[in-house]
């Protein structure tokens, strides 16, 4: 039996399943079955679509049904008409779909939100990214991105575990919006950086778990690391908008 | 035989082939064969991938080989690692691939450019979009987006035919970079708005041609409209970076 904080922490870790080659697709789909019952859920996107087709996306969503959040991460960033077509054909079976806030509301995200609402899927908007290039345009324009997020009212936003100060600023601006934070592990963020330091609800881990020979142990290891850093925060999630 | 300006204009019109449902995929692939020898080329993206799989993307590129520009438009907007995976698995056979300038250089576009260079494909960066939402974040941050474009040095950039003044500003800032302008037709831009008023090299037309029962005639109609507006500009392309 996990100590309470570890049990709570593991439910805050989403595993990103991004195949690097066709041979990875089946291995990562098998992994979905393993990690789904343990962690917060899974995230699949363009690499899975490119290498495994829409069938692999649908299979990932099916395997994780009832086992946590199923996040479709195509980083949608086109005009409303095109994002709508993509959402209609790909987001069935997913709990949430990720798009970019910088696309803007008019003729863009307003159409996507309507489509996702109709499919019972939640919208997550990227307001900052985990790689260094995010400092060049996204971060200087964060105020405008947060203004779009306030207008669109997504269920969640993405802010980077690699820069917890950005997560903290997003949390301050959007106190009741769920924050998902990629960038833990291969990209340099340490488990707990976003949840403990920034106030995020979820951390997204990719290669650190998906590249492990024993993904469930690796996932537990991430959770233990987070739990050791901020047990009180995990047990008394201040935002009240923890995973539902 | 087309009058010279019409002959030149038709070589400046790229047809976007975006299926709205699975049944459209084959029809649009057949259309690729028709329009490729006539216009400047084709653009396919997420709807074709979602509804026809990577096989449909590859088929579109194959059908248009030697018949003009083949542009892959996934609006890539992720960290470098993910964009690299997508480019490696999908951009073979394409002449150019579109990504978003706002992703930034470090850990983002620098990796994508290297991958595309290795595949012999050219990078096109979106610096502004054709829908009204582009006024909310992208346009106010255009200076920063153009700075990223100057650093990345893509073969081309995307700027909207729906706002020719933005095209003109991009042309002024990036005098030798090819400008591709979507937004003609269904989105409200008139043929020639980007080329004649803004100095773009190509206009991208989607449903106006792809939705026509006679796409080649519709394509010629667009070209005649452009040619009537600025014959001299077409015949003496000032930027010298006309389609090559």
Curated annotation (Swiss-Prot), chains A, B:
It catalyses: orotidine 5'-phosphate + H(+) = UMP + CO2. Pathway: Pyrimidine metabolism; UMP biosynthesis via de novo pathway; UMP from orotate: step 2/2. Gene3D superfamilies: Aldolase class I (3.20.20.70). One of its GO terms (molecular function) is orotidine-5'-phosphate decarboxylase activity. SMART domains: OMPdecase. The active site is at residue 75. Substrate binds at residues 18, 43, 73-82, 130, 182-192, 206-207. Belongs to the OMP decarboxylase family. Type 1 subfamily. Catalyzes the decarboxylation of orotidine 5'-monophosphate (OMP) to uridine 5'-monophosphate (UMP). Homodimer. This is Orotidine 5'-phosphate decarboxylase. The lineage of its organism: Archaea, Thermoproteota, Thermoprotei, Desulfurococcales, Desulfurococcaceae. The gene is pyrF.
């Amino acid at each position: 039996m996990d100590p309470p904080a570890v049990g709570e922490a593991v439910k805050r870790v989403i595993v990103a399943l991004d195949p690097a080659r066709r041979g990875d697709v089946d291995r990562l789909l098998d992994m979905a079955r393993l990690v789904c019952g343990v962690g917060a859920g899974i995230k699949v996107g363009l690499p899975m679509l490119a290498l495994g087709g829409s069938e692999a996306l649908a299979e990932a969503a099916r395997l994780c049904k009832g086992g946590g959040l199923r996040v479709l991460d195509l980083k949608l960033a086109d005009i409303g008409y095109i994002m709508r077509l993509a959402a209609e054909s790909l987001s069935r079976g997913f709990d949430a779909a990720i798009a970019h806030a910088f696309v803007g509301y008019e003729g863009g995200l307003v159409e996507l939100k309507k489509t996702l609402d109709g499919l019972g899927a939640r919208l997550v908007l990227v307001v900052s990214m985990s790689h260094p290039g995010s400092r060049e345009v996204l971060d200087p324009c964060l105020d405008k991105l947060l203004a779009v997020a306030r207008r669109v009212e997504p269920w969640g936003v993405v802010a980077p575990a690699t820069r917890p100060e950005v997560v903290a600023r997003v949390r301050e601006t959007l106190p009741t919006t769920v924050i998902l934070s990629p960038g833990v592990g291969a990209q340099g963020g340490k488990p707990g950086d976003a949840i403990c330091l920034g106030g995020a609800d979820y951390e997204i881990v990719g290669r650190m778990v998906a590249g492990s020979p024993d993904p469930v142990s690796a996932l537990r290891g991430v959770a233990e690391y987070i739990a050791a850093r901020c047990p009180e925060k995990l047990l008394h999630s201040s935002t009240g908008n923890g995973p539902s």
